[in-house]
Amino acid sequence: MNNTYDVIVIGAGAAGLMCSIEAGKRGKSVCLVDHSSKIAEKIRISGGGRCNFTNLYSNPSNFISNNKHFCKSAFAKYTQNDFIDLIKKHNIDFYEKKLGQLFCITSAKEIIDMLIAECIAQNVEISKETKISSLTKNHNTYSIKTNKGVYSCSSLVIATGGLSIPKIGATDFGYRIAKQFNLKVTNLLPALV
């Protein structure tokens, strides 16, 4: 089995799934790695199990950031309307609850299934139950030792999320990696998004 990829994404939540899909669309070989046997657990429980997947009125002014232009560039590349188009492409019925909040009529599982289908369409390899024991960088290559062997890539994305819900798999892995690579981490504060 070849474990060398252009991109490895660690964390199979909403951000990790979308990042994997978009990298695949750009012609990159992608492996999405997660420690859990189930992916996208936070999506599954969001919105009371119906997944509040976007807001019609989202725009850069709704976000607080040290870089006031970050959200502008992000929204210029992918908007809530792009995601709504993806939902429609997969024939997922949804409704507006209040103030632009969009929810699935049936279940959040539809969103998870859609994201997995999009990963498959982009030839993203999904590796569940993959426990990482070490992560190193040598020149332009990352090496990731796991219980399933050694993976390597030239681009690594850490999309492990925060510490909000440990019982569904949240860990401090991303923070430990940030510390290992001397990346600045801001003070952690509870927030409602």
Regions found by a protein language model. Give the residues of each.
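Predominantly flavin-linked oxidoreductase catalytic cores and closely associated redox partners
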Residues: 118-193
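N-terminal Rossmann-like FAD-binding beta1-loop-alpha1 element of flavoenzymes
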Residues: 5-32
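Aromatic/hydrophobic pocket-lining residues that form π-stacking "cages" and hydrophobic walls in ligand
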Residues: 19, 115, 174
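Hydrophobic/aromatic ligand-binding patch that stacks against planar heteroaromatic rings
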Residues: 18, 22, 43, 156, ...
